[in-house]
Amino acid sequence: MKINALLSAGLLVLGWMLGLGSAPCDAKERDPRPREESVVQLALLLDTSNSMDGLISQAKSQLWRVVNEFHGARQHGRQCVVEVALYEYGNNSLSAGTNYVRQILPLTRDLDAVSEALFKLTTNGGEEYCGAVIREALDKLSWDKDANTYKAVFIAGNEPFRQGPIE
């Protein structure tokens, strides 16, 4: 139940990202030629603080289920190519100077690498700065500028979004 609420919060972040946070696609930036592939870009943000001890396995499974849903998606009659980035946050083994945020993988099409990295994550400690990890994903990933590319951020954590220096 708690994880479903967390993923629902991730969908709220998605709306924010698509409306405000993604790189703007000005008409002059768009390529008028049709793309040969339909692309889906996902950023997975996972709270690895100690407060996630009892939830971490379920959170990983839910995030991976999201990836699998998009992996089977079609757009304009074509199978979508899925690119996934992975972040962890809230882990005391991460630097306070990075707001306890670490990019594990940039956007990649290697879903085996994403799965391996995701399921290796463990919990430790806890300063869960949701705003910082969201900002990092929005600002630092190489998001496709094509307006037809579906871009989404999914965050799984159990703390309020207002913690930390970035709200």
Where are these regions (language model features)?
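Positively charged n-region of N-terminal signal peptides that target proteins for export
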Residues: 1-6
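Bacterial N-terminal signal peptides
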Residues: 8-20
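Divalent cation-coordinating acidic motifs and surrounding scaffolds
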Residues: 23-167
